[in-house]
């Protein structure tokens, strides 16, 4: 088995779904590099553009409580048929943040398989995200994926 490790920042929208407790998320991320520097002033990090294609993310979020949710979806990497399918491990969390216009949350997803490069894939992806009052999503992923 081979490991693929990635970090990407997805941006897009969340909108109401088919029922009152369901949302649909659609985001995308360009190829990037993540720089993290630790120094005398503390820590600094940023995503910077890199040559390459985009990843497309689509999911369905089901709210299960005041701050909890379940999620399942797909991430397509590039223009080919390289897709990951994922679902929530236990529950995700979405709550208030220090910015009154933003909700903030985190979730861990299990890779349930995939297609193309990800056929038979397994692993986990963590997501730390914000959701604005207008439905704008910024979603930071860190994934460790096992492929054949």
Task: Kindly give the residue locations of the regions a language model identified.
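Beta-strand-enriched cores of mature, soluble protein domains
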Residues: 1-148
